[in-house]
Amino acid sequence: MGSQSNAFFAVPQGHHGMLPAADRDERARQEFIRSFKAFIQSDIVPGIHATYHHEVKPLHEQRAGHPPRDRHEIRELMTQHPLFRNYASLQRVSQELLWDVVLDSIERTLPDLVARARSQGKHAQGSLTLNPKLSLPKYAVGVDIHCMPGGYGGEGGPDDVTAGALYDRGVYLYALGMMGPMNDDIGGSAAKFVRDRFPDFKPRRILDLGCTVGHSTLPFVDAFPQAEVHAIDIGPSLLRYAHARAESLGKRVHFSQQDATATNFPDGHFDLITSSILFHETSAKALPAILRETWRLLAPGGIAVHGDLPPFWAMDEFNQFMLDCETWYNNEPYWGAMREVDQVALSIKAGFAPENVEFCMAPSAYRAAAGHDRSFEAGEFAPGNAWQVLVTRK
């Protein structure tokens, strides 16, 4: 079977040698979750907007003499409204069900997935280096981020690939297929941004921080075929899957289990460093350390491009409130706090010159090619048709 699809998805998920196979019943349950999530976005979220702007906000202005001052005050008001309470409950239920239905097919086929991963590693172009002595950061293992069972650091055995398989299929369902067939829109958009913005830039070595299963890593292999590409993450199961997935797609990447705050690479080793939706899944202590490590690892003239959603100063208070629901209902404790951090100031403090730090927008490569807009307004992959990128140069 070349892809897993139904009429609801914007595009079928692209096939590769590690994609977990779902039987008929499992596909039906996965399709239900996808349509359930699509219903929340298309039928309930617009009602949340209307309720706030036409009911909650005017009533508060009448009583208090001023509009709600910030997302926190909006939250205090909206959590009293039954429509928002229903929305928040449905969002949480849909997320927990998502992982449950994907996990069914992974647990059923896990021996085959492990065997496939071993087979892909026998004649590898790239490499996989794990470090069982690595102390996993508390922010990553103290909570199941995205409500994903086991989180990023979960591991069920010495050859386990469960976390990687769960993340790969789960992200596709969570994003409603809008990240493209290979879940790679952030990486593809960032890679295209670098090529368009710096047409003469020829990186010799590239590093992807917090690569998970390599969704955003592989576009850089294609964009810069002459470069040696490395990718790191803290989860061994994620990395086993990432390595096997990349090999099945014919992409040469060197994966290693490392903490992005303190890697074992030498000073100035990379010409290009990238990350995709990493910052908001770290912590107030880790983020400055990651920026300092980025500065250390960049060669003179090197470029770093970190893709994420916009900081709160770039949106109005209501959209801040809607996006901050990820903090409250999707096990993302640093989601809201990160968007209040002055990333430019942190980058300068890490060593980058002020004139070499800027926020830019990287247009969505997938949506531009597909010719359609993003169809949902809340969650990890919203809003708009571009990714906010923090660009730093050394």
Language model feature labels by segment:
Residues 207, 217-262:
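Class I SAM-dependent methyltransferase SAM/SAH-binding core
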Residues 350-356, 363-394:
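Core SAM-dependent methyltransferase catalytic element
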Residues 261-273:
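A short acidic, Gly/Pro-enriched loop at the edge of an enzyme's catalytic core
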Residues 9, 14, 18, 22, ...:
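N-terminal auxiliary segments of SAM/dcSAM-dependent transferases
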Residues 305-369:
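C-terminal alpha-helical "lid/dimerization" subdomain adjacent to the S-adenosyl-L-methionine
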Residues 288-300:
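A short glycine-rich, Lys/Arg-flanked "PGG" loop and its adjoining helix->strand segment in the class I
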Residues 166, 180-202:
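Conserved alpha-helix/loop element of class I SAM-dependent methyltransferases that forms part
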Residues 202-212:
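Conserved class I S-adenosyl-L-methionine
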